[in-house]
């Protein structure tokens, strides 16, 4: 008798520990759903479900263990009923049951489910016993086939989404050509130093060729300017003034006009 009592106490301690773990997991999961719903991800939710499933399987193994006595054969009798508030019961039930009176005992110590639930359980048990092994095997195969088709569709959708993202992110330029173009524009890398045809060899710094090309600046042509043009302009102005002075009836103009050459090149020294 003492051995059975010790075995029952050990079984109850194991069940209480397993149920406490399940309760803590449920509390944590509900807290996440209520307070962290905006940051939750599907992997986190699936991890929580997997944890709860594993804990329920462990509890089921404890109940089905051969060393676990059949709890349905045990009779629970309340030793003390009181309408007054009991602090010890409040602590054990975490504030859920403040009073252990005649009103709450039938609900908390009930060992049988509701009549509707009990009837449904009997119906399911009867259907399970009438099912043959061949029919059960066919149902299992059909279920496995449906799961395989579902997994194939999910994999196909994932592949199509990955291909779509790759098409969108495909490069429309050649990085090598882009780098070469930037290096040529910024540093002159890869550019050939060719001279136009008909031009002489290398010249000393500060000298220009016959074609008026500035050394080191290909494509920039210097406009040749000489002092003879200024002299010609001065002579032309002097001739105009002399002709005006020689004409009868006209007074010579005392206004001096300085005409600058409009073709003066800004780089002319």
From Swiss-Prot:
Cellular component annotations (GO), alphabetically ordered: core mediator complex; mediator complex
Annotated compartments: Nucleus
GO annotation terms (biological process): protein ubiquitination; regulation of transcription by RNA polymerase II
Signal sequence, renumbered to the chain: none
Regions annotated as coiled coil: 1-26, 134-160
UniProt entry tagged with the keyword Coiled coil: yes
Disulfide bond entries: none
Any Pfam family matching the protein: Med8
Keyword Transcription regulation: yes
Keywords tagged on the record: Activator, Coiled coil, Nucleus, Transcription, Transcription regulation, Ubl conjugation pathway
UniProt-annotated stretches for the region Disordered: 190-269
Comp. bias regions, Low complexity: 221-235
One Gene Ontology molecular-function label: transcription coregulator activity
Family: Belongs to the Mediator complex subunit 8 family.
Assembly description: Component of the Mediator complex. May be part of a multisubunit E3 ubiquitin-protein ligase complex.
Function noted in UniProt: Component of the Mediator complex, a coactivator involved in the regulated transcription of nearly all RNA polymerase II-dependent genes. Mediator functions as a bridge to convey information from gene-specific regulatory proteins to the basal RNA polymerase II transcription machinery. Mediator is recruited to promoters by direct interactions with regulatory proteins and serves as a scaffold for the assembly of a functional preinitiation complex with RNA polymerase II and the general transcription factors.
Protein name: Mediator of RNA polymerase II transcription subunit 8-B
Species assigned in the record: Xenopus laevis (African clawed frog)
